[in-house]
């Protein structure tokens, strides 16, 4: 009896609130109603008035509202603002109520964007709160404009921060300064525990203050937080200092910026054990002997540069004397004791303006690319950095030894020059022998093997971020001991000959105890190595790799007869020795134009006995026999293979090899995407293919998009599902195959005649079904009784016009 009594008490309490609200509303509307010329408007419903009053006084009535019966609470939920709606979620679930429809409506009305069709939204509350946090942080939404977003009792950032799993920082690092401000300390602490992915999009040049804020933000979110993935997208002209800052912080290195306060969390972790200054330097690997070696190397670089400048100067101008101080200032490295500076300067002597520190650092990347082998000579020139406006030299931001020693370049000391007027300068002739990147001390890069680190991320992604030699050296040096890294994506970064340094660093990483790298995704326009040789080199360097995706859009320079033979890679990168056994489970390769040597691909496949998924995109072989050699290798050495995909390959002359594949490989899924499979001898080949499939009991998925199957081919394919077939096919993709409605209807009737049960999914995208809409609808209706049909409303006439216009 206790439960009904409690329910009755809550109902009475709600009625009292309703009565009080009605009286208050009536008294407020009485005066305006008398003066209204058109007469009083219809009063709101009693329940709506009550709900509004409860929503407006939730600060006092919240506990009582939570205890209301489910039917009453369900009517109040849409009237609450987002803060109380979020807080009441757990109580609503206990009463069997869902708020997902309310959050979806809020998304449609306030965000006014449609989620991607590829995105499956499992929780609209979390999605709304995450987007709301980002909009408030960037200032793109005004919370005071809507009463559902405005409540003086709550902080929009703090209340929504615990739902943020992914945060994107754009342009001029908007939001970084706000997050590290003292009023938002609790917001940052919440983000540190909830945020998993940090993305940077379309970054532009930023000032010193913004970079300092980003430094503190990354330290909190990565070193003391839960961020495990950092992704950079579309950064056409990366700023060297900012890029290196993001990389080093992601790798677990931390050094306070000039004038910044010590980290509170670091102090709590040390429990009173404050590391000495020497200990802090050792942590970051900035040891004096290595700094001196770097300075000597830098002096030699600058001396060579000055010699070339003197040759181009008028004779009246005296030659420039390179001093230790001029070298340090031009490189903008900071972090050295002021006692090491000598009084002489070279910029004033030559009449050249002294660049500011960031400008010098960012401009230094292009000349350092001369360290590359000759095979990179025809690579596209890297994008030049933006230069400071004329007449604006900018103040020096590193003053005194104390501030300089805390600069990021105290950790990563970058030595490079500036490429001017197409001038060629070979760094290897200057100092430190041949600067091949193998000796980090010559470049001022610290030895990380013995260094201690903070927490680092496990996934790093760089999409369309051109890497200068300076940035590539930094990345490779960090990768060599980044044992926590599990997945690395480098997409269209213009690596060029820096790919050799990357392979060296990956080989060094693989030799580290506890190396976790299991997935590598690499794609670029050009490569100094043919793609198969590059694949062999990666597999040798990373034998524990599980997933490898590699794509090169254009042929390598070694495939060009005009490139001299001595422009090849180092001998330890590419060799003829046999590849050792590896752990590859998934291999995806996108080939440039030109025939590929089948033996090289077979050598990779033979060493990949655990391979389960293989995808070849745009692969071309010299003859059908070479393609058959690859299939024979798969049959003999890749017994665990389950999925095989061919895309954009001309298999019109490889019909016997395709039949061998269907008869001899025990695959679960095969894809022939735009492979011109039925271009030749379709009348003879289709029955042979159908017969092979009818005897294949392991194949469950067949994808044939873009193969000109047509109505005749579709009807022949229907025989796979006949009564005498032992096929287990349950997924069929016949998109883009010139199928007409009458052929699809006949296909549906044959499936009905044979009485096969539901076989799964049928994909019909981009076929000629719009030529007879009535017949197409009837065919799809019949098919849906047998399988799940996925189709679209495709305009075939417009598509044909587009095709003709491009001929």
UniProtKB/Swiss-Prot annotation:
Biased composition of type Low complexity is found at 352-381
> Its function?
Probable substrate recognition component of an ECS (Elongin BC-CUL2/5-SOCS-box protein) E3 ubiquitin ligase complex which mediates the ubiquitination and subsequent proteasomal degradation of target proteins.
Q: Where is the composition biased (Basic residues)?
A: 382-396
Record region (Disordered): 269-290, 304-335, 349-403
Where are the Phosphoserine residues found in this chain? Answer: 155, 276, 326, 368
Q: How does it assemble?
A: Part of an E3 ubiquitin-protein ligase complex with Elongin BC (ELOB and ELOC), RBX1 and CUL5. Component of a probable ECS(LRRC41) complex which contains CUL5, RNF7/RBX2, Elongin BC and LRRC41. Interacts with CUL5, RNF7, ELOB and ELOC.
Query: From which lineage does this chain's organism come?
Result: Eukaryota, Metazoa, Chordata, Craniata, Vertebrata
Q: What GO terms describe the biological role, i.e. biological process, of this protein?
A: protein ubiquitination
For this UniProt record, the keywords arranged alphabetically read as follows: Leucine-rich repeat, Phosphoprotein, Repeat, Ubl conjugation pathway
Q: What is this protein called?
A: Leucine-rich repeat-containing protein 41
Q: Which residues carry this modification: Phosphothreonine?
A: 327
């Amino acid at each position: 009896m206790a439960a009904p009594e409690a329910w009755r008490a809550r109902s009475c309490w709600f009625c009292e609130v309703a009565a009080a609200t009605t009286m208050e509303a009536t008294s407020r509307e009485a005066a305006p109603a008398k003066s209204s010329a058109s007469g009083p408007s219809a009063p709101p419903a009693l329940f709506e008035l009550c709900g509004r009053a409860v929503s407006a006084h939730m600060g006092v009535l919240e506990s009582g509202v939570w205890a209301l019966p489910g039917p009453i609470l369900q009517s109040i939920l849409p009237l609450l603002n987002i803060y109380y709606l979020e807080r009441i979620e757990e109580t609503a679930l206990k009463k069997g109520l869902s708020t997902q429809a309310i959050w979806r409506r809020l998304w449609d009305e306030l965000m006014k964007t449609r989620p991607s069709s590829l995105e499956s939204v499992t929780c609209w509350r979390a999605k709304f709160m995450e987007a709301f946090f980002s909009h408030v942080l960037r200032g793109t939404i005004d919370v005071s404009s809507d009463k559902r977003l405005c409540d003086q009792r709550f902080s929009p950032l703090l209340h929504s921060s615990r739902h943020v799993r992914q945060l994107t920082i754009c342009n001029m690092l908007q939001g970084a300064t706000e997050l590290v401000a003292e009023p938002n300390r609790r917001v940052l602490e919440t983000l540190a525990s909830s945020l998993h992915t940090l993305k940077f999009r379309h970054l532009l040049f930023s000032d010193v203050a913004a970079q300092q804020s980003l430094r503190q933000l990354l330290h909190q979110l990565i070193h003391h937080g839960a961020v495990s993935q950092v992704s950079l997208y579309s950064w056409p002209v990366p700023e060297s200092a900012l890029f290196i800052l993001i990389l080093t912080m992601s790798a677990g290195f931390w050094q306070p910026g000039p004038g910044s306060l010590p980290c509170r969390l670091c102090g709590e972790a040390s429990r009173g054990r404050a590391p000495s200054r020497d200990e802090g330097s050792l942590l970051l690997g900035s040891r004096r002997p290595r700094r001196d070696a770097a300075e000597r190397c830098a002096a030699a670089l600058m001396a060579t540069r000055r010699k070339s400048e003197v040759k181009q100067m008028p004779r009246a101008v005296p030659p420039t004397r390179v001093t230790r101080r001029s070298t340090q200032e031009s490189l903008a490295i900071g972090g050295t004791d002021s006692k090491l500076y000598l009084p002489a300067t070279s910029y004033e002597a030559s009449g050249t303006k002294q660049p500011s520190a960031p400008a010098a650092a960012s401009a230094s990347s292009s000349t350092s690319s001369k360290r590359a082998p000759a095979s990179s000579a025809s690579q596209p020139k890297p994008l030049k950095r933006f230069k400071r406006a004329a007449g604006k030299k900018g103040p020096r931001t590193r003053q005194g030894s104390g501030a300089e020693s805390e600069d990021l370049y105290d950790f990563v000391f970058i030595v490079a020059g500036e490429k001017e007027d197409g001038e060629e300068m070979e760094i290897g002739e200057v100092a430190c022998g041949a600067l091949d990147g193998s000796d980090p001390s010559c470049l001022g890069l610290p030895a990380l093997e013995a260094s201690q680190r903070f927490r680092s991320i496990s996934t790093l992604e760089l999409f369309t971020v051109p890497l200068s030699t300076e940035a590539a050296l930094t990345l490779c040096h960090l990768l060599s001991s980044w044992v926590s890294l599990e997945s690395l994506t480098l997409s269209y970064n213009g690596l060029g000959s820096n790919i050799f340094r990357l392979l060296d660093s990956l080989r060094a990483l693989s030799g580290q105890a506890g190396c976790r790298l299991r997935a590598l995704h690499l794609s670029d326009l050009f490569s100094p190595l043919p793609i198969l040789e590059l694949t062999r080199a990666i597999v040798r360097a990373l034998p524990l790799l599980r997933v490898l995706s590699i794509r090169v859009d254009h042929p390598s320079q070694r495939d060009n007869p005009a490139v001299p033979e001595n422009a090849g890679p180092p001998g330890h990168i590419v060799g003829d020795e046999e590849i050792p056994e590896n752990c590859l489970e998934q291999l995806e390769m996108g080939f440039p134009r030109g025939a590929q040597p089948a033996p090289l691909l077979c050598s990779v496949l033979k060493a990949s006995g655990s391979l389960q998924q293989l995808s070849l995109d745009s692969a071309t072989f010299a003859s059908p026999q070479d393609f058959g050699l690859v299939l024979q290798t798969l049959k003999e050495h890749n017994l665990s293979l389950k999925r095989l995909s061919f895309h954009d390959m001309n298999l019109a002359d490889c019909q016997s090899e395709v039949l061998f594949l269907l008869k001899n490989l025990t695959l679960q899924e095969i894809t022939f995407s735009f492979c011109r499979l039925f271009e030749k001898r379709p009348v003879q080949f289709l029955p042979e293919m159908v017969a092979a499939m009818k005897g294949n009991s392991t194949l469950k998925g067949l994808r044939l998009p873009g193969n000109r199957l047509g109505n005749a081919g579709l009807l022949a394919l229907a025989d796979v599902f006949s009564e005498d077939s032992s096929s287990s096919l349950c997924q069929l993709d016949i998109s883009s195959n010139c199928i007409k409605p009458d052929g699809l209807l006949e296909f549906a009737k044959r499936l009905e005649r044979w009485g096969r049960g539901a076989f799964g999914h049928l994909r019909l995208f981009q076929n000629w079904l719009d030529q007879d809409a009535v017949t197409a609808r009837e065919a799809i209706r019949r098919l849906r009784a047998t399988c799940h049909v996925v189709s679209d409303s495709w305009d075939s006439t417009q598509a044909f016009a587009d095709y003709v216009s491009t001929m």
